[in-house]
Amino acid sequence: MILERLHNNEIINNMSLESKFVRDQLVQPIFIHEDEKNETTIPGLGKNKILFESNIIETISDDVKNGCRNFIIFFVPKTKSNNQFITSFQENILLKIKKEFGSEIEIWVDLCLCSFTTSGHCCLFEGEKINYADSLEIMSDIALSYVRGGADGIAPSSMLNGIVH
């Protein structure tokens, strides 16, 4: 199988170069909190800040002006739950970003349940045991939501077995 996307997409092609280092191999992390209204510096991550809906386009625009075209988004939902995972905020943010920038940038999205769950774990539990089936199903639903929003890639960071085959 020929991976057409590598050949037809300059940004992805540059990310996979082996013999030289180019700016397109760098990925800017973006942290977006659903309920945050003020920029907050993230301890231990230099000048990275937790962003919010009203400043995300301006922030990405500034990064693009500085030559950054690859971004990975880490969403922090307002409400934590172990049984209800609403991704409309995330999907709408992605749609907004893609509408503004189109194929000028690549957007990857972190996939894990840890920011969604009340426990902060990468999975759902049934009693004291990991519920693999429900965890994988929920993560699949979240990934599909990101794709509907226009994410160019999904970056599974979950420590749960079975996420990546």
What are these regions (language model features)?
Residues 80-99, 105, 111-126, 141:
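N-terminal active-site wall of soluble small-molecule enzyme domains
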